[in-house]
Amino acid sequence: MATVESGPDALVERRGHTLIVTMNRPAARNALSTEMMRIMVQAWDRVDNDPDIRCCILTGAGGYFCAGMDLKAATQKPPGDSFKDGSYGPSRIDALLKGRRLTKPLIAAVEGPAIAGGTEILQGTDIRVAGESAKFGISEAKWSLYPMGGSAVRLVRQIPYTLACDLLLTGRHITAAEAKEMGLIGHVVPDGQALTKALELADAISANGPLAVQAILRSIRETECMPENEAFKIDTQIGIKVFLSDDAKEGPRAFAEKRAPNFQNR
């Protein structure tokens, strides 16, 4: 399997069963770059294809999560040119997790600003942790730009309609406390502790049966917005495969023997 290489704009680190992806342009508040997104796509592929990776964390360096598009760089070339020259392609969409969801849990560990594309990437994650001073917002409309990371479609599916419209149409920024109250994030921790909390969550997830975790995640996604009677058919099909696995035998056996289970992902 190909190794994911870290680069100046993004760092990739393996800790146990968890892959940590760090956006690494702190001088630009971790604004997105072509190189950063290339490495991120490689990392997503690694998470999906490496059976020993059970969880992934996305974070940012230097006390920033991600400021989205590099607006200063955009002054060198009209933003619309990327649609003409082909630079806005599938790899960029994949990096932003637009239309792509990982097969394993993805946790966001947010410190500082997660603005525009930063909040858009956030919506592609499953569990979200933020330092108490973190800021969120989808501010593209302020600069007569459009949220190409998918927020006009998926934000309203994640928080109440009127709150989604408020954020999208005013472009205002909100605090971590407000984001938690809206349901955009799940955990608020002291500043500097977001990654620590994310690692705790990743360890808890990785200790569970990987087949069960991935199946639950798949069922959540595949049945989203479906009528229950249709969703339960898919839910049952996915669940039966888990019950037929070797790990489904190991779990109850470990419980009966009062020991930690040794799951083999099969």
UniProtKB/Swiss-Prot annotation:
* Gene3D superfamilies on file: 2-enoyl-CoA Hydratase, Chain A, domain 1 (3.90.226.10), Lyase 2-enoyl-coa Hydratase, Chain A, domain 2 (1.10.12.10)
UniProt entry tagged with the keyword Oxidoreductase: no
Catalysed reactions, as listed in the record: (22E)-3-oxochola-4,22-dien-24-oyl-CoA + H2O = (22R)-hydroxy-3-oxo-chol-4-ene-24-oyl-CoA
Keywords, ordered alphabetically: Cholesterol metabolism, Lipid degradation, Lipid metabolism, Lyase, Steroid metabolism, Sterol metabolism
List-wise, which residues carry N6-succinyllysine? Answer: 135, 142
Per UniProt, subunit arrangement is:
Homotrimer; substrate probably binds in elongated tunnels between the subunits.
State which Enzyme Commission number(s) the record gives: 4.2.1.-
Q: Which residues are named in the active-site annotation?
A: 120, 140
Phenotypic consequence of gene deletion: Not required for growth in a mouse tuberculosis model. Not required for growth on cholesterol.
Tell me the pathway: Steroid metabolism; cholesterol degradation
Its ancestry begins with: Bacteria, Bacillati, Actinomycetota, Actinomycetes, Mycobacteriales
Domain of life (superkingdom): Bacteria
Name it: Enoyl-CoA hydratase EchA19
Q: Name one GO biological process term.
A: cholesterol catabolic process
Which family is this protein grouped under? Belongs to the enoyl-CoA hydratase/isomerase family.
The role this protein plays is: Degradation of the cholesterol side chain involves 3 multistep beta-oxidation cycles, this may be involved in the second cycle. Hydrates 3-OCDO-CoA ((22E)-3-oxo-chol-4,22-dien-24-oyl-CoA) to make (22R)-HOCO-CoA (3-oxo-chol-4-ene-(22R)-hydroxy-24-oyl-CoA). Also acts on octenoyl-CoA. Not active on (E)-3-OCDS-CoA ((E)-3-oxocholest-4,24-dien-26-oyl-CoA) or 3-OPDC-CoA (3-oxo-4,17-pregnadiene-20-carboxyl-CoA). Hydrates the same substrate as ChsH3, but the 2 enzymes make different stereoisomers of the product.
Q: Name one GO molecular function term.
A: lyase activity
